[in-house]
Regions:
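Bacterial N-terminal signal peptides that target proteins for export
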Residues: 1-9
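Beta-propeller folds
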Residues: 19-528, 534-545, 559, 594-595, ...
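Active-site-proximal cap/loop segments of hydrolase catalytic domains
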Residues: 88-93, 99-101, 585, 591, ...
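Short beta-strand element of the alpha/beta-hydrolase
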Residues: 566, 574-585
Length: 814
């Protein structure tokens, strides 16, 4: 087992110069008051559109919750006390609302609830949710539209595979589905009578051995892999589940089949069959559970196998950016009782192979005795499929990695070869994104594209040179003509949540502005909004903050932008200490690199460890600062350093030109790849007085098989990896650097050792550096005490080295 806290690791850190345990600190009261404001509820519409559930997320769980036991095995983080995911996200309360009236209906929930879901029955009469407790694990609860709920006694759900996110955060509930009959639930239970968990042997049976006999494929660096036979035993113990059906009225539980490591189980649209994927040995110590060998089978409701769809071997030879051979993306055709659809590679799963078609879609109907029927082929890699409610109509997409071109075809799965190109665009071209087809719940519980005659409806972000203006369009499939039904105005950010009828005559929106908190409204095309909710402003103290979209150019002419935030008491002409906060992205061309993202018309809400807290401390913040890296996808990183320095210089120059920034007092920061960017800028420029690097990876040689969109390995492009490793230039970092890292970082490539080694490199070369390891925190930080402390660290560091630039370097703050 890989524990959450590594004692030898902490002992090593304690030996480092200047390292020691410190108590959690709190930021100033003004920051705390804003940070601890209540969260805004989130609505989930019922299939009938007559009701919505309203959940209030738990924003900051206490660090004690994150400190609960954690098993880090097979790419999953398991809480053995609950048999669910560790560090899961929950709602603290649940309410019903009638739509469109907005009338609230209280929902009976248990005290101190940690709720996940809910999931509506297909007829919208009932909903199911889970409650996670230390005593009972993951409980199953059922509610109705009157707000009455009850717990299904004797049911303990297994949330290891069905918790929403596969071990990386996500919801904490088990895998629960409504059957098409609206009366029955399919659930995954903790294996009955499984006994006590495996005990770590006092004496190992022998060494842990890995061996490759050639033919292996490059593997990305991953966290939380199996490490020994005991880990394997733990994985089997906690991941093994028992499928069962539950009668929603009586609570009767009927076991289905034998227990197994059930990765997924999906009810057929006809409600008579199950598509079950079961993981089995041999496991891998280099891959997560998703790559383990598995069997994909069709079962009847007694658990008897009626058809073997595929036996999938260990996916240890799949090339990076490639796909497995054999059936993948296996699913039910949602408008037939029991027809399977899946995708198979025609190029061996490797983009390096030149073939006329890369993928094909196959279909096989019950009783699954005939030969699969080919229904579509894609020239590029299959990107997704959305089905219509009636007939064989579907939208199928493919994508070409090098050009980033995504194409969408309208095809009839019942008439192979009959396909029309509907859209083709660069996936990074936000300005020409047609939007996403809106779906509708079918009587069997599946969701299909909503079709109104020849029309479908598209919902999109509406990116533009002035920011995002979400829209609702009617799109004619026959003529490919688009009619706009709604677009957010220039003073608000308003997005369509759902249609309230099949013709877009009424729809539900979420509307906000810089001074109006997000609320839900009912609209008609061209009509005025009618309020459904009236949530109050949770943070009135930040309402005077100035927010502005600023556009400018890089020295080579690439269009750039940032969102400028200024304190509410800012006086024009005052030059402020400034924070540049950013995250680099790669682009094929300057046109897409220069596109504006986001909107200044959104409600300003500051939470977590947001960089916007600096505004409350008297800083100007250049948020979402564009840091494009432009070039051929195969070689774009050859000039990463030069481009990111040019991006940063252009941003500072613009802010200084506007009169809001004191050039002598500018700092930089970022999270993950933004942290890597921060290290790079401090190593290769003198633009900044200090930096903040959260959960970064400054040594690219520790990610030797690629990172971000880099396609070459360390051995193919060693000079690029070395140049792009600010760790190698630690002796050049003279500006004070604050390194913050979750002690239990779960992100690929950003191992905590990255920041540990960077600290040693800068310290050993005489630089000013501080390393903060956050107990029990992953790649993103969640604990209440952690969030408070991180805000204190960041503000204190910048107050000392940026706001107070030129002052004494000694301080009692640390």
């Amino acid at each position: 087992m890989k524990p959450a806290t590594k004692v030898p690791f902490l002992l090593l850190l304690a030996a480092l110069a200047g390292f020691g345990a410190e108590p959690y600190r709190k930021p100033p009261k003004a920051v705390l008051d804003v940070m601890n404001a209540p969260t805004t509820p989130v609505l989930s519409l019922s299939p009938t559109r007559a009701y919505a559930t309203e959940g209030r997320p738990v924003r900051y769980p206490p660090i004690a919750e994150l400190a609960e036991p954690m098993l880090r095995i097979a790419g999953i983080r398991i809480n053995p006390k609950t048999n669910g995911l560790h560090n899961a996200t929950f709602n603290s309360s649940l309410t019903l609302r009638k739509i469109p009236e907005g009338t609230e209906i209280p929902v009976q929930t248990p005290p101190n609830a940690r709720l996940s879901g809910p999931r509506w029955s297909p007829d919208g009469a009932r909903f199911v949710f889970t409650n996670t407790t230390a005593a009972n694990g993951i409980e199953l609860w059922i509610g109705d539209t009157a707000g009455k709920t009850h717990r299904v006694e004797g049911v303990r759900l297994n949330g290891v595979m069905g918790g929403g996110g596969g071990g990386r955060g996500g919801g904490g509930g088990g895998d629960v589905q409504w059957m098409p009959d609206n009366k029955t639930l399919l659930v995954s239970l903790v294996k009955p009578n499984r006994g006590a968990p495996p005990v770590l042997p006092a004496v190992p049976a022998g060494p842990t051995v890995q061996e490759s006999l050639g033919g292996g494929a490059p593997q990305a660096t991953l966290e939380d892999m199996l490490q020994n036979p005991h880990d394997e035993d733990l994985f089997v113990y906690y991941a093994t589940a028992q499928l069962a059906t539950v009668d929603a009225a009586s609570g009767k539980v009927t076991l289905v089949g034998k227990p197994g490591i059930i990765e997924s189980a999906r009810v057929s649209p006809g409600g008579k069959d199950l598509l079950v994927t079961t993981i089995h040995k041999p496991f891998s110590y280099l891959h997560a559970y998703r790559s383990f060998p598995k069997d994909v089978e069709v079962w009847d409701l007694t658990g008897k196998m009626v058809h073997k769809v595929a036996s999938v071997p260990l996916e240890d030879k799949v090339p990076i950016n490639g796909v497995m051979t054999g059936p993948r993306n296996i699913q039910w055709r949602l408008n037939e009782p029991a027809t399977l659809l899946w995708v198979e590679a025609l190029d061996g799963g490797d983009l390096k192979n030149s073939v006329p078609y890369r993928d094909r879609i196959l279909a096989l109907a019950a009783p699954f005795t005939g030969e699969p029927r080919e229904v579509f082929k894609t020239q590029q890699r299959f990107g997704g499929m959305q089905l219509f409610a009636k007939g064989g109509m579907a939208l199928v997409s493919d994508s070409e990695r090098k050009t980033r071109i995504v194409r969408t075809f309208l095809t009839d799965l019942d008439k192979p070869g009959d396909a029309r190109l509907i859209w083709s665009r660069n996936q990074q071209d936000r300005y020409h994104d047609p939007g996403t087809p809106i779906g509708k719940a079918m009587p069997n519980g599946a969701t299909a594209i909503l079709q109104d005659g020849d029309n479908i409806f598209l919902n999109g972000a509406g990116a533009s040179p002035t920011g995002d203006h979400p829209f609702l369009d009617r799109f004619n499939l026959a003529t490919k003509q688009t009619e706009n039904l709604f677009r957010s105005d220039d003073d608000h950010f308003e997005s369509v949540v759902a249609l309230l009828d099949d013709h877009a005559g009424r729809f539900l929106t979420r509307r906000e502005s810089p001074t109006e908190p997000p609320n839900y409204y009912v609209r008609t095309p061209g009509g005025s909004p009618t309020a459904v909710t009236r949530f109050p402003d949770p943070q009135p103290s930040v309402r005077g903050i100035h927010k502005e979209l600023v556009k400018y150019k890089r020295a080579d002419g690439v269009d750039l932008s940032f969102t400028l935030y200024l304190p509410s008491d800012y006086k024009p002409g005052t030059k402020l200490p400034t924070l540049v906060w950013a995250y680099p992205y790669e682009y094929n061309d300057a046109a897409t690199a220069g596109q504006v993202s986001g909107s200044t018309k959104r409600f300003t809400e500051i939470a977590g460890y947001s960089q916007l807290f600096f505004v409350l401390d008297g800083y100007a913040v250049l948020d979402n600062t564009a840091m494009p890296i432009v070039g051929d996808p195969d070689t774009v990183n050859n000039t990463f350093v030069e481009q990111v320095v040019g991006d940063a210089k252009a941003a500072i120059d613009k802010a200084v030109e506007m009169g809001v920034t004191d050039r002598a007092r500018v700092g930089v920061g970022g999270h993950s790849y933004g942290a890597f960017m921060t290290d790079t800028l401090l190593a290769h420029s003198d633009l900044f007085k200090a930096g903040i690097a959260e959960s970064g990876a400054p040594n690219r040689t520790l990610t030797p098989f690629g990172f971000q969109s880099e396609r070459r390995t360390l051995w193919q492009a060693p000079e690029v990896y070395l140049k792009m490793s600010p760790f190698m230039y630690a002796d050049k970092i003279k500006a004070p650097l604050l390194l913050i890292h979750g002690e239990a970082d779960d992100n690929s490539g950003t191992f905590p050792i990255q920041s540990e080694r960077m600290y040693e490199a800068v310290r050993g070369n005489g630089g000013i550096v501080r390393l903060v390891f956050l107990p029990f925190e992953a790649h993103g930080y969640r604990g209440k005490e952690t969030i408070e402390h991180v805000n204190w660290e960041k503000l204190t560091w910048f107050d000392k080295y940026v706001k107070g630039a030129g002052a004494s370097t000694t301080s009692n703050n640390y």
